[in-house]
Design a protein with these regions (language model features):
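Bacterial N-terminal signal peptides that target proteins for export
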Residues: 2-13
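A solvent-exposed, acidic/Ser-Thr-rich amphipathic alpha-helical stretch
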Residues: 32, 36-39, 53-103, 127-130
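Bacterial signal peptide processing site
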Residues: 26-28
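C-terminal motif of bacterial Sec signal peptides marking the signal peptidase cleavage site
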Residues: 22-24
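Long compositionally biased, domain-poor regions of proteins
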Residues: 40, 47-49, 86, 120-123
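Short beta-strand edge/turn micro-motifs at domain boundaries
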Residues: 131-158
Length: 162
């Protein structure tokens, strides 16, 4: 093997090693990965609502400066105020939801999810009632990388056909 081929092979080998190193140091999150991560976070949020109650779940997943917007009501500003409205009587109802889709901005600091919810409760006559709806949550990625809900809004939908 000539000296030219040896030096060229060595040079190419070094370039490959350096290129591989630089690529591994400059990996950016795949937007589809972050989108799936956000969708999974909303699913965990929904599961916590079933396990611990909606008030506790919202208290955990809302950003400190979150805004809650329920149909027919004034917006509720701040995580603590939203929690105060939800915690009393949370054992009297169940709020379940199923995230349908998530999207994340190219900057990966904002995203949104939407889905369908069912609010179940026992009325004054002891009969189980269900209210159906859809929601849209706007999420903000925190400094620690976790997603928190910045805006929670929802409105009612007709009951699904049986």
């Amino acid at each position: 093997m000539s000296a030219f081929y040896k030096s060229t092979s060595k040079f190419l080998g070094i370039l490959l090693i350096i290129g591989g190193f630089m690529t591994s140091c400059n990996i950016q999150d795949d937007p589809s990965t972050e989108k799936q991560r956000l969708l999974n976070t909303d699913k965990q949020f929904a599961q916590m609502s079933l396990d611990k109650g909606a008030g506790e779940a919202f208290n955990y997943y809302l950003a400190d400066d979150a805004m809650g917007m329920s149909a027919g009501q004034q917006p509720v500003m701040g995580r603590e105020n939203n929690y105060a409205e939800m915690k009393d009587g949370q054992e009297d109802y169940t709020l379940a939801w199923e995230p349908q889709r998530a999207e994340v901005a190219a900057s990966e600091d904002l995203g949104w999810t939407w889905g369908k919810y069912v609010l179940s409760f026992i009325d004054d006559e002891g009969v189980e009632q269900k209210r159906y709806g859809k929601y849209l949550n706007i999420w903000e990625r925190q400094d620690d990388g976790e997603w928190k809900v910045l805006v929670d809004m929802g409105n009612s939908s007709p009951a699904p056909e049986k």
